[in-house]
Swiss-Prot record:
Residues engaged in binding Zn(2+) 2: 253, 256, 275, 278
Name recorded for this polypeptide: DnaJ homolog subfamily A member 3, mitochondrial
CDD domains in the record: DnaJ, DnaJ_C, DnaJ_zf
Domain of life the protein comes from: Eukaryota
Length: 480
C-alpha cells in the first residue's frame, strides 16, 4: 500500500502481489473499483465491479499502523484512487461564522452577513491581513445558508455533502468556497439594504473620501468658491459604466436565460436561486474594459468648485456631493495677524498715543470688511474694549452677524524730546494720586518742585515764560 497526502486530498494505492501465471490460471483478475470517502482511518470499498463474489459492496477495510492491510479478504487486486479529506474537519461551521442559530430565518442570516461584511471588508481593514480571508468565509457561509437547497444539504451532510468526491448528497455543483466573487455578493446584498433602516449601500461600501482644505482667515469668515482636485470613484468614462470594452458586446447568459436566476430541481422541490454563472447580472462580460476591468467604475481626477460657506470654523467638516458620490471636506483655517475669533465675534487691538488716551480723538482700525474710523473717548484706559455691533462674522447656524470688539492699547514712547520731558515733569508735579516716586520729581503734590540735578532743569529755565503758559494750559486740562 502507498499513500500520498496533501492538505485536502489523500491518494491511496492498495494491492497485493500479482498471482503467478500458473496459480492464476483460470482465475479472473479484478477489473478495478472505486474507494469512497470515510472519516478517520477507515476506507469503504463501495464497489469493485467484477469478481467480488460473496463480498458485497461496502465491505469494510481498516488501515492500521505499520502499513498493513487487514479486513475482508478478496481476490488479489490493485486499486489506485484519490479522495477528498472530510471538509467538515477543515471548515468552521457556517452558522458559527455568521453568528446565527441553526434555526435562524433568512432575514436574520442576511442581517448577520450585512453587519459582519461591513466589519471585515478589506477596504476598511487594510491593516488586518486576515480580513480578506474572513470576508471570503462570510461570503461562502452566506451563499450556502441563503439558498434553501444548499442549506438543507448542509444541515444533512455538513460541508462534506458539497464535495465533488461525495455523491450521496445528490448534488455535485458545489466545489468549496464561494462560487461568486465575494465583492459582487457584497454589492448585491448591500444593494438590497439601500432603502432599509440598516443604512445606504453606497454609504457603507464606498466610504466617502476625506479631504483637507486650507483657508485664510478672511476666506473662512466671508466665504469663498474654491477650486479643488479630488480623486473619486465614478462611472467609467471609457465604457460608460457598462463594464465591457467599447466595440464589444456582452454575451447572453444561457445558464439562466438572461434572468439572473436559475431553477434547481431537487426531487419534489423546485427552487429559484441566483445564477452562479453570471452572478445575477443576466449577461457575461467576455471582454472587460481595460480601465475599470469590468466594474463599470474607475477612480478619476476631477476639478470641482467647492462653495465654502461664510463663517466656517477651523476643523469643521462639511459633506459635498461630487457627481454620484459624496466627499467630506475638513477646513483648516489659518490664523490672522490682526483678528482673533470667538464664535461669530472677532477681536482686534488698536494702539493709540498717550495724548489720544488722555484727550480723546479718533483712530483708524482695520475691520473685517472695511477700514473703520473709531471714536476714542477722553480718558480711555488700556485694554478697554470698544464694541462695533454687527461688524463680525456671519452666524453659520442662525441669522445675523457677530460683533467686532476693539481692545485699546496705549503706546508709551520710549524716547522724549527735551520739550516733551519738561512737559511731563511739570505734569508730574501736580499729580496727586501717585503711589511711590517719579524719577526727576522730589514731590508730586501741588506746589512740589523738581530735582535740581535733573537733566531737564536747565532746559526748563531756558524755556522761559512761553513754556510756563503752555504748561499751565496742559495742567488745567489734565486736572479738570
Amino acid at each position: 500500500m502507498a499513500a500520498w497526502c496533501s492538505p485536502r486530498w489523500l491518494r491511496v494505492a492498495v494491492g497485493t502481489p500479482r498471482l503467478p501465471a500458473a496459480a492464476g490460471r483460470g482465475v479472473q483478475q479484478p477489473q478495478g473499483g472505486v474507494v469512497a470517502t470515510s472519516l478517520c482511518r477507515k476506507l469503504c470499498v463501495s464497489a469493485f465491479g467484477l469478481s467480488m463474489g460473496a463480498h458485497g459492496p461496502r465491505a469494510l477495510l481498516t488501515l492500521r499502523p505499520g502499513v498493513r492491510l487487514t479486513g475482508t479478504k478478496s481476490f488479489p487486486f490493485v486499486c489506485t484512487t484519490s479522495f477528498h479529506t472530510s471538509a467538515s474537519l477543515a471548515k468552521d461551521d457556517y452558522y458559527q461564522i455568521l453568528g446565527v442559530p441553526r434555526n435562524a430565518s433568512q432575514k436574520d442570516i442576511k442581517k448577520a452577513y450585512y453587519q459582519l461584511a461591513k466589519k471585515y471588508h478589506p477596504d476598511t481593514n487594510k491593516d488586518d491581513p486576515k480580513a480578506k480571508e474572513k470576508f471570503s468565509q462570510l461570503a461562502e457561509a452566506y451563499e450556502v445558508l441563503s439558498d434553501e437547497v444548499k442549506r438543507k444539504q448542509y444541515d444533512a451532510y455538513g460541508s462534506a455533502g458539497f464535495d465533488p468526491g461525495t455523491s450521496s448528497s445528490g448534488q455535485g455543483y458545489w466545489r468549496g468556497g464561494p462560487s461568486v466573487d465575494p465583492e459582487e455578493l457584497f454589492r448585491k446584498i448591500f444593494g438590497e439594504f439601500s432603502s432599509s433602516p440598516f443604512g445606504d449601500f453606497q454609504n457603507v461600501f464606498d466610504q466617502p473620501q476625506e479631504y483637507i482644505m486650507e483657508l485664510t482667515f478672511n476666506q473662512a469668515a466671508k466665504g469663498v468658491n474654491k477650486e479643488f482636485t479630488v480623486n473619486i470613484m465614478d462611472t467609467c468614462e471609457r465604457c460608460d459604466g457598462k463594464g465591457n470594452e467599447p466595440g464589444t458586446k456582452v454575451q447572453h447568459c444561457h445558464y439562466c436565460g438572461g434572468s439572473g436566476m436559475e431553477t434547481i430541481n431537487t426531487g419534489p422541490f423546485v427552487m429559484r436561486s441566483t445564477c452562479r454563472r453570471c452572478g445575477g447580472r443576466g449577461s457575461i462580460i467576455t471582454n472587460p474594459c481595460v480601465v475599470c476591468r469590468g466594474a463599470g467604475q474607475a477612480k478619476q481626477k476631477k476639478r470641482v468648485t467647492i462653495p465654502v460657506p461664510a463663517g466656517v470654523e477651523d476643523g469643521q467638516t462639511v459633506r459635498m456631493p461630487v457627481g454620484k458620490r459624496e466627499i467630506f471636506v475638513t477646513f483648516r483655517v489659518q490664523k490672522s495677524p490682526v483678528f482673533r475669533r470667538d464664535g461669530a465675534d472677532i477681536h482686534s487691538d488698536l494702539f493709540i498715543s498717550i495724548a489720544q488716551a488722555i484727550l480723546g480723538g479718533t483712530a483708524k482700525a482695520q475691520g473685517l470688511y472695511e477700514t473703520i474710523n473709531v471714536t476714542i473717548p477722553a480718558g480711555i484706559q488700556t485694554d478697554q474694549k470698544i464694541r462695533l455691533t454687527g461688524k463680525g462674522i456671519p452666524r453659520i447656524n442662525s441669522y445675523g452677524y457677530g460683533d467686532h470688539y476693539i481692545h485699546i492699547k496705549i503706546r508709551v514712547p520710549k524716547r522724549l524730546s527735551s520739550r516733551q520731558q519738561n512737559l511731563i515733569l511739570s505734569y508730574a508735579e501736580d499729580e496727586t494720586d501717585v503711589e511711590g516716586t517719579v524719577n526727576g520729581v522730589t514731590h508730586t503734590s501741588t506746589g512740589g518742585r523738581t530735582m535740581d540735578s535733573s537733566a531737564g532743569s536747565k532746559d526748563r529755565r531756558e524755556a522761559g515764560e512761553d513754556n510756563e503758559g503752555f504748561l499751565s494750559k496742559l495742567k488745567k486740562i489734565f486736572t479738570s
